[in-house]
Amino acid sequence: MVFADARVNDLEALMPGMIDFIVSRGVNNYNGDPYPKLYIVNEQKVCTGAYGKPMDICDIAGYYNDDTNEIFIRDKPTKNMTEDRFQEVVLVHELVHFLQYHDGTWQKVTCKQELESHAYEVQDAYVDLYGIDPQQKIDPLFGLLSSMCPRANPMLFHQHLHGGD
């Protein structure tokens, strides 16, 4: 657990610069809200927290809990990511969601999936800026599909059969 604590401290030290980087992209604002508490946890805890029900496996690298102002990041990369600054890349993505929640963007979107689009753009720009392994960038097709609103695209999300969001 000592490694995780040291890693959390290292990542927390990066938060102010990451917030500045995100804000400099011209979409989000930082209003001085307390930074989120950061946790590095195993895959099961990330999956269960992200889906709100017990799950052992998923392909989610981390998530921001707006109720508790906490970010949870996996201790190991997902199958589509590499070790190269993995947790740092996930943190910058989740900090976009932190800002979206606190600057009101969260309430302005048609569906929560739309929030992913800007987080992916920031993540990719961060990877490029710091020369991080390009595999840490979002696959363009995945990015497109995961940021679409299910209700607006029923044929893609089988809502014509199942209904609801």
PLM segments and residue spans:
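Mature extracytoplasmic domains of secretory-pathway proteins
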Residues: 82, 99, 108-109
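Flexible, surface-exposed loop/gating regions in the mature catalytic domains
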Residues: 53-54, 104-110, 142
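Short, low-complexity, Pro/Ser/Thr/Gly-rich segments in the mature regions of secreted, periplasmic
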Residues: 143-165
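Post-HExxH zinc-binding segment in Zn-dependent metallohydrolases
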Residues: 110-145
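Auxiliary, metal-adjacent structural segments of Zn-dependent hydrolase domains
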Residues: 6-71, 130
